[in-house]
Curated annotation (Swiss-Prot):
Gene Ontology BP terms: cobalamin biosynthetic process; methylation; siroheme biosynthetic process
Modified residues (Phosphoserine): 128
Keyword Nucleotide-binding: no
Taxonomy of the source species: Bacteria, Pseudomonadati, Pseudomonadota, Gammaproteobacteria, Enterobacterales
Entry keyword set: Cobalamin biosynthesis, Lyase, Methyltransferase, Multifunctional enzyme, NAD, Oxidoreductase, Phosphoprotein, Porphyrin biosynthesis, S-adenosyl-L-methionine, Transferase
Region (Precorrin-2 dehydrogenase /sirohydrochlorin ferrochelatase): 1-204
Similarity-based family: In the N-terminal section; belongs to the precorrin-2 dehydrogenase / sirohydrochlorin ferrochelatase family. In the C-terminal section; belongs to the precorrin methyltransferase family.
Associated pathway: Cofactor biosynthesis; adenosylcobalamin biosynthesis; precorrin-2 from uroporphyrinogen III: step 1/1; Cofactor biosynthesis; adenosylcobalamin biosynthesis; sirohydrochlorin from precorrin-2: step 1/1; Porphyrin-containing compound metabolism; siroheme biosynthesis; precorrin-2 from uroporphyrinogen III: step 1/1; Porphyrin-containing compound metabolism; siroheme biosynthesis; siroheme from sirohydrochlorin: step 1/1
Domain of life of the native organism: Bacteria
CDD domains according to UniProt: SUMT (cd11642)
UniProt gene name: cysG
Protein name: Siroheme synthase
EC number(s) reported in the record: 2.1.1.107, 1.3.1.76, 4.99.1.4
Species of provenance: Escherichia coli O17:K52:H18 (strain UMN026 / ExPEC)
Function text: Then it catalyzes the NAD-dependent ring dehydrogenation of precorrin-2 to yield sirohydrochlorin. Finally, it catalyzes the ferrochelation of sirohydrochlorin to yield siroheme.
Cited PANTHER family: SIROHEME SYNTHASE, SIROHEME SYNTHASE-RELATED
């Protein structure tokens, strides 16, 4: 970390801007909004500065820069179009032990100005460390669209309630659950926006006085196939609100880095032929943590209801009366095929898709005759160890040996690897790949050479 993000209290503190043009004006607006006692020094000023001075909002010092202007300052900004002058201001500020920002010259500055999302009292600052201001601006714009304009009013109102909430709810967990209910209550937010005092009071009393459910809950979240950018917005919200995250091997490190920092993390990863934690024990972990009153996220790669055993885990919770919900994820078949340039359906080649597990419970047998039919795409999950059997069975039941096949390893991740060939080569191809891998069989695989976009990135 090259810069420490801090929020400075500048109200009624002396600050200096050197420069009287448009760039200096933008910086001045920020300092004035923060309540700074502002002095602006320049040889000439644009009209806005004169208007501010006439209104008593700042002091103008016309003339060359003099180091004595820094004597009482807490903070300075060099915002002229003269690089040498900006450097002199920076060096003088350094000698005075005053933080100084130099516009468009982060290496000459002792602090940099972030992109700001202002929902006062809630403030969000985004910075690229001065390396890419455009990137910081794009991120700010994206965050602006996610944060409602009335969020500041809700945050300010929450500050007024802190004392009462502390008296009403004895434990930290109870208080956190109350605040989470308040911040997502649309009626309260709208009432604050409309300054409807009656509705504000009614909604607040309802939230404070309704009984808190001391039972925990479990949210089954699909993490998607690997690329953290494919995690859904709702999935992200859930892992950032969790007390406990129970996760498996298919959840990438990039996604785990998004988990709430103080959440407990329980790894229950599985590998082909080896279960780190038996399924029954996983069920009991979810049950045990929820019974402690915790918010538990069961985080699974792909989609939890597609070969994720999510249904089995939820049955245990249902039988115990534990509340639960499900956040779907992008399943591996969809993600891996898209990132490999293989459309699962195509008007000319495939009118249906079969998602098939590569291993069944003891005694299970697939309907190989129907699987060998034309005009469909087959996607085998967890089928790497059974690739030779899949090849044999499909050919025995009439699928042409020249049918295109592909195996996708670590789909959608930067380490994705794809190998393709024909059905007669499937067993041999599988020996060159590692788990997790997905097998795709069908005429659509032949489009890969034309549609493969991800490897070019």
């Amino acid at each position: 970390m090259d810069h420490l993000p801090i929020f400075c209290q500048l109200r009624d503190r002396d600050c200096l801007i050197v420069g009287g043009g448009d760039v200096a004006e933008r910086k001045a607006r920020l300092l004035l909004d923060a309540g700074a006692r502002l002095t602006v020094n320049a040889l000439a000023f644009i009209p806005q500065f004169t208007a501010w001075a006439d209104a008593g909002m700042l002091t103008l010092v016309e003339g060359p820069f003099d180091e004595s202007l820094l004597d009482t300052c807490w903070l300075a900004i060099a915002a002229t179009d003269d690089d040498a002058l900006n450097q002199r201001v920076s060096e003088a500020a350094e000698a005075h032990r005053i933080f100084c920002n130099v516009v468009d010259a982060p290496k000459a500055a002792s602090f940099i100005m972030p992109s700001i999302i202002d929902r006062s009292p809630l403030m969000v600052a985004v910075s690229s460390g001065g390396t890419s201001p455009v990137l910081a601006r794009l991120l700010r714009e994206k965050l602006e669209s996610l944060l409602p304009l009335h969020l500041g009013q809700v945050a300010k109102y929450a500050g007024q309630l802190r004392g009462r909430v502390k008296q009403q709810f004895a434990t930290m967990g109870e208080r956190r659950r109350f605040w989470e209910k308040l911040f997502v209550n649309d009626r309260l937010a709208q009432s604050l926006a409309n300054n409807d005092q009656k509705a504000i009071t009614e909604t607040t009393e309802q939230l404070i006085n309704e009984p808190l459910d001391h039972r925990g809950e479990v949210v089954l979240v699909g993490a998607g196939p690997g690329d953290a950018g494919l995690l859904t917005l709702k999935g992200l919200q859930q892992i950032q609100q969790a007390d406990v995250v129970v996760y498996d091997r298919l959840v990438s490190d990039d996604i785990m880095n998004l988990v709430r920092r103080d959440a407990d993390r329980v790894f229950v990863g599985k590998r082909a032929g080896y279960h780190c934690v038996p399924q029954e024990e996983i069920n009991q972990i979810l049950l045990r943590e929820a019974q402690k009153g915790k918010r538990v996220v069961r985080l699974k790669g792909g989609d939890p209801f597609i070969f994720g055993r999510g249904g089995e885990e939820l049955e245990t919770l249902c039988n115990a009366g534990i509340p639960f919900s499900v956040v779907p994820g992008i399943t591996a078949a969809s993600g891996c095929s898209a990132y490999s340039g293989i459309p699962l359906t195509h008007r000319d080649y495939a009118q249906s898709v079969r998602l098939i597990t590569g291993h069944l419970k003891t005694g299970g047998e697939l309907d190989w005759e129907n699987l060998a039919a034309e005009k469909q795409t087959l996607v085998f999950y967890m089928g790497l160890n059974q690739a030779a059997t899949i090849q044999q069975k499909l050919i025995e039941h009439g699928m042409p040996g020249e049918m295109p096949v592909a195996i996708v390893e670590n789909g959608t991740a930067v380490t994705q690897r794809v190998i393709d060939g024909t059905l007669t080569q499937l067993g041999e191809l599988a020996q060159q790949m590692n788990s997790p891998s997905l097998i795709i069989i069908g005429r659509v695989v032949g489009l890969r050479d034309k549609l493969n976009w991800f490897s070019n990135h």
